[in-house]
Amino acid sequence: LRDNAELYNVYDDSGIVTMYLTVSRGNDSENTNHSWAEINHYSAYDYTAMGVARYQVNGLLQVGDENGPLAGEVGYDTLAPNATVQIRGQTSSRYTQKNYKVKLKKNKGSWRGQRTIALNKHQGEGLRFRNKMAYDLIKGIDQMMGLRTQFVHLYVKDLTDSASGVFEDYGLYTQVEQLNKTALKAHGVDPNGQLYKINSFEFYRYEDVIRLTTDPAY
């Protein structure tokens, strides 16, 4: 099993990409009739307790530089929403600064071949760059598969409760390639292969649960 090394040479991921996200209300049938305040209030555990799917809002994603959206980039010269936005993550969703999943709608283009844009804040990580550094190091290890990453400077304009608004600086995020069929194909592996999601990933001993196979209580 080998990664597609050439994939990491297509784009320069050493700098910072600027993204502009305008959020607005959608409709009940698509679960997008919510406020931006609601999106940032509830954690994954709150949704489980309420027994509802994670709230979403409509989003207009535009990519550019610090001067604004750029021609040729996704969302340029676009007025209508081209995406949906919701929180992502599990434990991290309890932080005040959320991680976001921005999913571009069908026929609304893609960004670097990706329609799902995962933006991670890493609020619990003081330096904010260790995750990207880890993926950058993985690129040099032939025996490991990696994911594409990019630092993102995010600006958000909230129109969910007002017809007017200004872009607010949300600071630095790390965009991490969403591991799905599109990513599997891009990395040169079987897009129909099986993906498994780990529900619990920790390094604690749990002596009352983790036992040797020779233990009678195994």
Residue map of PLM features:
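Phosphate/dinucleotide-binding and metal-coordinating scaffold of catalytic cores
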Residues: 1-218
